[in-house]
A protein has these predicted regions:
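Transmembrane-helix signature of polytopic, membrane-embedded enzymes
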Residues: 11-17, 93-116, 135, 294, ...
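Transmembrane-helix motifs of polytopic, lipid-linked glycan transferases
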Residues: 15-18, 80-101, 136-143, 282, ...
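Aromatic- and kink-enriched transmembrane "portal" helix at the membrane-lumen/periplasm boundary
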Residues: 26-28, 48, 60, 71-79, ...
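Membrane-interface alpha helices of multi-pass inner-membrane proteins
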Residues: 44-47, 110-112, 155-169, 181-183
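Membrane-interface transmembrane helices that cradle and orient dolichyl/undecaprenyl
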Residues: 99-104, 124, 140-158, 163-166, ...
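Perimembrane helix-loop-helix junctions
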Residues: 149, 175-206, 364-365
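Hydrophobic, aromatic-rich transmembrane alpha-helices
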Residues: 269-291
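C-terminal luminal/periplasmic domains and tails of membrane-associated envelope-modifying transferases
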Residues: 389-400, 410-413, 419-682
Length: 682
């Protein structure tokens, strides 16, 4: 362990380490609300509400302070919060590398390389919890090294308190536990295991963790957002532990799927550091004391385990491996420091080569800065804001709007709660999490939220005297009352009484009011932005078809397919539409594209089943539907599709079995019951 370093770092280097990322991050940040969780998190901070599990109380409280800064829109202020915590993370990593190596140059190179890696930089442009999380990861590593220098109890006490605060932002902090426990127990465990000290440390940890009392307090106070209503013990624990979906995340995939995910994780890390991984490996081998070599290896190992085995979210939409990247930056710095020492000894009589090597090290951060600038520059990205404007420009006065899908719900949440848009419109989200429907069950549970909502939703559609609109990406999944049929209406959908379509049912006027700059702009779009842009163009293509402009519609739909080139859902939905219009050859091409990017292979098999169904090859359709059911046995839609194919194939008894399986999963399907009755299949 190095002795105390009296001179921490020259001010000039500190200024560069802080100022350069500040300037770059602020220049490239999104100017308003972003897609994904950004709208929900911003609205939660603005209203001191409760976002999705685990509730993120510390994020909401700090975010509220940023919302009060009178600079730009609220969405921009929250994006700046992400940037600022990324800058603090960069400074802490610099501090740690310098403490380990006492080398200003290696600290500079390793730190600024980290600052401009895509995985960190991309999180600075929008309101998300990840830069606050990695700030705590870096802070905890820095505090732990500080404690390990002389084992002062006050330092470990501070570390424990900050650990509790870190849990107040993100539960992934627990993945640091094995590495931290090893350092502590291999260091000075006797003092820590003293009963008095242990009680004091436990009290400090619980004091910091008491941040979570924010959840029931704000729920009782009637916060505008109170996801999960965590004001009872059961709901509080369910929300904090994310039990509603965690059981579906942990060890639910096949061996081959985990191998594939592990490969994706490894490729993601390699894409961030490239050949510098060899320098990081050298830095790890030269890390002293040996205990810290084990510590850094353990952090990477357990972060990898979390990424691969404890989560199923796509790498396209979530910032995985950030703790690993923090560690790798430290190891790169240590590796560069060792290489420079060896080069200096080898060049004792000639400083030219050594000077060239130092100059090369200074240039290292320029590589990610230049190569990733276009990828991370979101300064022209208004996509989420334009989407919520377009939604509200579609709906009529005093209408009812149902929402489904994060990229519909969360931008509207921002617009409604933060900017008070269209307060004449009644908004409901179909899962009843943010915009609650009336007459709900008192015993709310996230597990039964979806199913318990259908009957209430149907009653609203049946009894409303106002226009009904749906902002959904999968209208076929909406179970309408039997006398209604869903039709596209601009970028939204509207239920109309079957066979009773007014002339304006296509939403022609809405298309003339839409904002399309971001959908048409050429700035780099991540997966979520590509999906939204592809959705917009696909809806436009459908509208053109409906108005008799088939050739232009095909051209626009082809563009939608190109924009969503790696989007299984987009290709599948386009294929379904083209099949319905009789373009079976073009539909087959889209289905083949969907197979390449098979995030939802069950859905792809379902669409192949529909393709064969349209061809009249019912046996192949049955085979495809059965494959889909094997992958997603809880999907009642898949059983309905199988039942229809079996019925057409003349296998009435098997069709009845399939429909009964569907009704067992979701009894509230009046159209299915009507089909069974009309075809004597009950």
């Amino acid at each position: 362990m190095p002795s105390s370093v009296k001179r921490f770092t020259p001010y000039g280097t500190e200024i560069i380490i802080v100022l350069l990322p500040v300037v770059v991050y602020l220049y490239t940040t999104c100017p308003t609300v972003y897609l994904g969780d950004s709208g929900e998190l911003t609205a939660a901070a603005f209203s001191l509400g409760i976002p999705h599990n685990s509730g993120y109380p510390l994020y909401a409280l700090i975010g509220k302070l940023f919302c009060m800064v009178p600079v730009g829109p609220i969405g921009f202020r929250m994006n700046v919060m992400s940037s600022m915590f990324a800058v603090l993370t960069v400074w802490l990593v610099y501090s740690l590398i310098f403490r380990i190596t006492t080398s200003k140059l290696s600290s500079f190179a390793g730190t600024l390389f980290l600052a401009f890696t895509p995985v960190l930089w991309s999180q600075t442009v929008s309101a998300e919890v990840y830069t606050l999380h990695v700030f705590f990861v870096a802070l905890l590593m820095r505090l732990l090294w500080w404690w390990d220098e002389d084992k002062q109890f006050v330092r470990i006490a501070l570390f424990v308190f900050v650990t509790g605060l870190s849990f107040g932002n993100h539960m992934q902090t627990v993945m640091l536990a094995p590495a931290v426990i090893f350092i502590v127990l291999s260091g000075h465990y006797r003092t820590l295991l003293n009963a008095k000290n242990l009680c004091f440390l436990s009290a400090l940890f619980l004091l910091a963790l008491s941040l979570y009392l924010y959840l029931p307090i704000r729920t009782e106070a009637g916060a505008a957002i109170h996801w999960g209503d965590p004001n009872t013990l059961d709901r509080f624990l369910a929300h904090v532990t994310a039990s509603a979906h965690r059981e579906g995340y942990v060890l639910t995939k096949s061996t081959l799927e985990y191998v594939s995910r592990a490969k994706q994780a490894a490729l993601l890390v390699f894409s961030q550091f490239g050949p510098l991984l060899l320098v990081a490996l050298w830095g790890w081998l030269k890390m002293r004391p040996l205990r810290w070599q084990i510590f850094f290896g353990a952090v990477i190992l357990f972060d990898f385990a979390y990424t691969v085995f404890l989560n199923i979210i796509s790498f396209e939409i979530t910032a995985f491996t950030l703790p690993t990247c923090i560690v790798l930056a430290v190891l790169v710095g240590n590796g560069i420091a060792d290489i420079l020492k060896r080069a200096r000894r080898a060049s004792f009589h000639s400083t030219t080569m050594y000077g060239a090597l130092r100059a090369a090290c200074c240039m290292i951060p320029l590589i990610p800065l230049v190569s990733n600038f276009g990828f991370c520059n979101q300064s022209r990205n208004y996509a989420a804001y334009e989407h919520l404007l377009n939604i509200f420009r579609t709906v009529s006065s005093r209408s009812i709007l149902f929402l489904d899908g994060d990229d519909n719900i969360f931008p509207v949440t921002y617009g409604r709660i933060v900017e008070q848009m269209r307060e004449d419109v009644t908004v409901y989200d179909r899962l009843n999490l943010l915009f609650r429907m009336p007459d709900r069950y008192d015993d709310y549970s996230p597990k039964n939220a979806e199913r318990s909502g259908y009957s209430v939703e149907q009653r609203i559609v049946e009894n409303s005297q106002h226009d009904i609109f749906y902002a959904v990406f999968n209208p076929d999944a909406v179970s309408l009352p039997v006398q209604f049929t869903m039709y596209p209406f601009g970028i939204l959908h509207r239920p109309f009484p079957t066979g009773d379509l007014p002339p304006e049912h296509l939403g022609k006027q809405a298309w003339s009011r839409y904002v399309t700059e971001s959908a048409d702009d050429t700035f780099y779009k991540d997966f979520m932005n590509r999906h939204l842009s592809a959705r917009f163009h696909f809806a436009l293509g459908q509208y053109l078809f409906a108005t008799g402009q088939e050739a232009l519609g095909l051209e626009i739909i082809k563009l939608a397919s190109q924009i969503g080139y790696d989007d299984t859902v987009i290709h599948s939905d386009i294929a379904l539409f083209l099949m319905g219009e009789g373009f079976l050859g073009k539909a087959q091409i889209e289905l083949e594209k969907a197979l390449v990017y098979n995030e939802d292979l069950g859905g792809v098999h379902t669409n192949w089943g529909y393709y064969y169904f349209k061809l009249g090859d019912y046996e192949e359709a049955v085979t495809s539907y059965k494959k889909a059911i094997e992958l997603s046995p809880d999907s009642f839609d898949y059983y309905n599709n199988l039942g229809l194919a079996l019925h057409q194939a003349g296998k009435g008894h098997e069709a009845i079995v399939a429909f009964r399986e569907s009704l067992a999963i979701n009894p509230d399907q009046p159209k299915v019951r009507g089909f069974l009755k009309n075809h004597n299949l009950e």
